[in-house]
């Protein structure tokens, strides 16, 4: 076993990132679209033009960037399986939600078959460190029948679920009014669009998607009734304040979530949105500093993912997931300190060249 000695350093539990898209790490700085629907379309084009080898490299680079920042656990959504393979190969920890798409009700069976095929490749990778889940992507990319089918699959197989939800005004316009740029794009593909006269949250409630532990990503465009529905379902929220700011979507009502008893975690979203994987910056954007930020990024984020009994604090009986920093936890917003050492399940996954094991 390696031994390290640090002077004037602090040891903290490994940080937990509740929302990433690490297979997109190579796309940082490559999408300058301003309007959200166009930005999404450009991401898809860039991703489709990427080779499988480059996606694998991007996923592994993203994991290593997380570890360099002291992040030991990620909750990642993606469609290629590259992040799951990276975690399994490199020895990381995380939940990987396999995305499924299909806005046309007529393609529901095909989308479900593709999801089943992908899960067939991912299930053998599952371990104590890697959980496999599903992610029906978003209300503008998933039909009502597909939402129901994926929710049923997740219940049968006890799979974790993540959904992008109530992120943008355009999403609300699509679901409530059957109008706006998302509606226009769907109709241009020959897909019928009807108004549902409800919010995106209520749309998923009505289709049985929201349940205990379902990770609802963003939840910016919500009202009091939506918050009550999230609480009653036992759902949890992944808040990505810098991404919401970058896309001008507004701010999630954190105080209202907390007052209602809806658990909230912090994530970074993709580097295509925010340029870096910086959980401390996300905490600062959410108004958290010092010990409050540290608790949120460790135990509270672990609790959102249902992993609080195994990680999130330096307690006897939990996994040895930890990070060492050369300076105290930031008391105010500022540059994120790099980790001097990052350990997952007792194994060193990040160590700068200047840090060497102590001679024995």
Question: What would you call each of these model-derived segments?
Answer:
Residues 1-12:
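Histidine-rich, glycine-flanked metal-binding segment
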Residues 13-25, 160-170:
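Histidine-centered catalytic micro-motifs
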Residues 21, 79-80, 99-103, 135-139, ...:
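Active-site beta-loop-alpha junctions enriched in small/polar residues
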């Amino acid at each position: 076993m390696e031994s390290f000695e640090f002077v004037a350093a602090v040891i903290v539990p490994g940080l937990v990132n509740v929302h990433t898209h690490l297979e997109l790490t190579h796309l940082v700085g490559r999408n300058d679209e301003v309007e959200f629907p166009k930005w999404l379309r450009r991401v898809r084009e860039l991703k489709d033009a990427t080779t499988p080898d480059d996606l694998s490299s991007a996923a592994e680079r993203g994991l290593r960037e997380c570890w360099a920042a002291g992040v030991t656990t990620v909750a990642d959504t993606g469609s290629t399986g590259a992040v799951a393979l990276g975690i399994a190969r490199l020895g990381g920890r995380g939940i990987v939600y396999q995305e499924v798409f299909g806005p046309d009700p007529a393609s529901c069976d095909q989308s479900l078959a593709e999801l089943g095929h992908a899960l067939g490749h991912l299930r053998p990778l599952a371990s104590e460190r890697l959980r496999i889940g599903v992610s029906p992507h978003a209300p503008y990319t998933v039909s009502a029948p597909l939402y129901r089918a994926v929710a049923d699959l997740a219940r049968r197989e006890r799979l974790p679920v993540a959904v992008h939800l109530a992120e943008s005004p355009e999403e609300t316009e699509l679901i409530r009014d059957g109008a706006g740029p998302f509606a226009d794009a769907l109709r241009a593909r020959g897909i019928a669009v009807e108004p549902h006269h409800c919010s995106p949250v209520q749309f998923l409630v009505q289709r049985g998607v929201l349940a205990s532990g379902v990770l609802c990503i963003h939840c910016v465009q919500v009202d009091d009734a939506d918050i009550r529905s999230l609480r009653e379902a036992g759902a949890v929220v992944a808040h990505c304040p810098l991404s919401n700011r970058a896309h001008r979507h507004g701010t999630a009502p954190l105080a209202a979530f907390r007052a209602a008893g809806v658990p909230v975690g912090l994530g970074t979203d993709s580097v295509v949105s925010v340029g870096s994987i910086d959980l401390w910056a996300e905490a600062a954007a959410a108004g958290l500093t010092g010990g409050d930020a540290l608790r949120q990024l460790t135990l509270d984020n672990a609790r959102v993912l249902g992993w609080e009994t195994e990680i999130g604090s330096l307690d006897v009986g939990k996994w040895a997931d930890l990070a060492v920093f050369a300076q105290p936890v930031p008391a105010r917003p500022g540059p994120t300190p790099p980790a001097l050492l990052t350990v997952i399940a007792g194994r060193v996954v990040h160590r700068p060249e200047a840090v060497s094991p102590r001679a024995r």
